[in-house]
């Protein structure tokens, strides 16, 4: 796993009270199932690991994630959408660092979150109350009811990020595509 992602998962998130369980990408389905905890909220991986260059068995990880009622989130930065389309193999959410291949020259800092709209958050309301219950900070909107499965996660991620970051220094450089 990319060093920045590893440090975020093992150090920063730990300080915030979030525990992350790491698994070997070559583990058996049984070992993978054993890594899940009752409070597991998501499974995260990279389509091609950086710097190891190992290719993730997306179908195996998607099947495990879905058996345990969590979305599979994949970082597809290294592979890019030209070489790998994770949704076709079962991923629910795909993230990209657009600063790399998509920008080409690292002239702009950016990222993308792409939601397949297929994960049913409403089947697990206790696990995902931020999407399935009214959000007081946005006039009581319930994201899954208002935006459906295809828009709930990405809308919440976008509006809360914009709210929490505050005014954008150069708004012409921020884009919201839904």
Where do the model's predicted regions map?
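Conserved PLP-enzyme active-site core in the AAT-like
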Residues: 1-178
């Amino acid at each position: 796993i990319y060093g920045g992602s590893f440090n975020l998962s093992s150090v920063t998130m730990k300080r915030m009270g979030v525990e992350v369980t790491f698994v070997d990408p070559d583990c058996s389905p049984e070992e993978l199932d054993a890594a899940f905890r009752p409070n597991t909220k998501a499974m995260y991986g990279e389509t091609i690991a950086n710097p190891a260059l190992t290719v993730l068995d997306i179908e195996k990880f998607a099947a495990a994630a879905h058996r345990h009622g969590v979305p599979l989130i994949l970082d597809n930065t290294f592979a890019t959408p030209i070489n790998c389309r994770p949704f076709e193999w079962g991923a629910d959410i795909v993230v990209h660092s657009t600063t790399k291949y998509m920008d080409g020259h690292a002239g702009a800092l950016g990222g993308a979150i792409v939601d397949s709209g297929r994960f049913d958050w409403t089947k697990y309301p206790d696990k995902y109350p931020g999407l399935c219950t009214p959000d007081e900070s946005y006039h009581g909107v319930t994201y899954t009811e208002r935006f459906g499965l295809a828009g709930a996660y990405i809308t919440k991620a976008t509006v809360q990020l914009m709210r929490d970051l505050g005014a954008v220094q150069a708004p012409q450089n921020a884009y919201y595509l839904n």
